[in-house]
Amino acid sequence: MIKHYIKDHVAVVTLSRDGGLNALSSQMLVDLLKIYKEIEKNDDVKVVVLNSDRRDFCAGGDLKEVYESFSKCNDRNCLMSYFTKEYDLDLFLATTKKPTITFWLMKR
């Protein structure tokens, strides 16, 4: 779902989810945070490029997953689990020292 590599001081992170308009699932949030933390520690990386290899860049959060998760357990903690992961990623991205360039080349 998330591809990444480092070349010439640039970390390239690619959203690559089949179906779902690249909506961010819980696992994608966890994976993105892990990748960004690894990049942050790597002094060789000067910039991050975030892109997509799908027709759609990213629809945002996976609301279907949030709804289904909450419907199964009907507990506020189930709902908060997703949003905690999302907030953790948002906070990290807002405070990281590495600049991120985001772009999308629409594929038809």
Across the structure, where does each feature detected by a protein language model lie?
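Conserved CoA-thioester-binding segment of acyl-CoA-metabolizing enzymes
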Residues: M1-N51
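Glycine-/small-residue-rich active-site loops that bind phosphorylated ligands and cofactors
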Residues: G20-L21, R55, K107-R108
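Alpha-helix capping and helix-loop boundary segments enriched in small/acidic/polar residues
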Residues: A23, N77-M80, M106
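Catalytic-core regions built around general acid/base machinery
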Residues: I35, K85-T96
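Short beta-strand/turn micro-motifs composed of small residues
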Residues: N51-S52, W104
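Glycine- (often His-adjacent) and acidic-residue-rich active-site loop
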Residues: S52-D88
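Glycine-rich beta-to-alpha active-site loop
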Residues: L93-R108
